[in-house]
Amino acid sequence: MASSSGSKAEFIVGGKYKLVRKIGSGSFGDIYLAINITNGEEVAVKLESQKARHPQLLYESKLYKILQGGVGIPHIRWYGQEKDYNVLVMDLLGPSLEDLFNFCSRRFTMKTVLMLADQMISRIEYVHTKNFIHRDIKPDNFLMGIGRHCNKLFLIDFGLAKKYRDNRTRQHIPYREDKNLTGTARYASINAHLGIEQSRRDDMESLGYVLMYFNRTSLPWQGLKAATKKQKYEKISEKKMSTPVEVLCKGFPAEFAMYLNYCRGLRFEEAPDYMYLRQLFRILFRTLNHQYDYTFDWTMLKQKAAQQAASSSGQGQQAQTPTGF
């Protein structure tokens, strides 16, 4: 990293985490690889300028604390202020599903999609049990772990998450119809496009679009051109509403259309039947005679890349293996 002013050269946060290099961007801040100088352990650090117009890292850190201990939720090491930044130190994770999709030439086998679907449904269900909805379900926000957690899927980036019911009374937030679209238009639910307050059903519908994105390589409402962001969102919304689920899922097992139709049929306050949705895909998985052995498409590719690297003096591996946050 250059030592010009404004760089993070010799930037130590929380007294012991030394920033190494930028590895990504979240919804509201940059993410850095850092090293714990007391034991050499690598961690991830999310930085947000204290001058940010809509600071949300403190909010996100509180959310992670509420979610701590859940499977596939990164562990928070430290939150505080350093120089002009709000700082969140957390577990270092592996590549996102978007990174891995690109690494696999934007093709996932049905086996990989179904193994992912199982973990993704469980991650979202856990967040919902803690009285929050994520509101930005997309491939970029699901990351694989590293080391002994390399087959475990993690859900990250809770900057847009919202409490949908009271912890004590279990009172659900009220239905509203004047909301701006929160999240990523490509994966947004139809109701989110229509300005309806989001609830559990919307996270689940978004996941349905993510799964079909992996199946199809792209969604019919991708690549639409428009003069303004607002017009683009309008076009995406129109295309989404005019594409029947059966057309979207044509050529793929009926379970994907069943999943989406189920999610779209949920009422605003209704709890999704997560087990039913997992079972849809688990039974399909068994019908297709797959083994749940955590051998994903990238597992094979990485092994091949590692073998090639080993035979060519061991230099090429990093270039071929997705890294980063």
From Swiss-Prot:
Domain Protein kinase: 17-285
Catalytic activity, EC: 2.7.11.1
Pfam families with a match to the protein in the record: Pkinase
Molecular-function GO terms, alphabetical: ATP binding; protein kinase activity; protein serine kinase activity; protein serine/threonine kinase activity
Positions of modified residues (N-acetylalanine): 2
Disulfide-bond pairs as recorded: none
Function: Casein kinases are operationally defined by their preferential utilization of acidic proteins such as caseins as substrates. Can phosphorylate a large number of proteins. Participates in Wnt signaling. Phosphorylates CTNNB1 at 'Ser-45'. May phosphorylate PER1 and PER2. May play a role in segregating chromosomes during mitosis. May play a role in keratin cytoskeleton disassembly and thereby, it may regulate epithelial cell migration. Acts as a positive regulator of mTORC1 and mTORC2 signaling in response to nutrients by mediating phosphorylation of DEPTOR inhibitor.
PANTHER family per the UniProt record, alphabetical: CASEIN KINASE-RELATED (PTHR11909)
Protein name: Casein kinase I isoform alpha
Organism: Bos taurus (Bovine)
The organism's taxonomic lineage, starting at the top: Eukaryota, Metazoa, Chordata, Craniata, Vertebrata
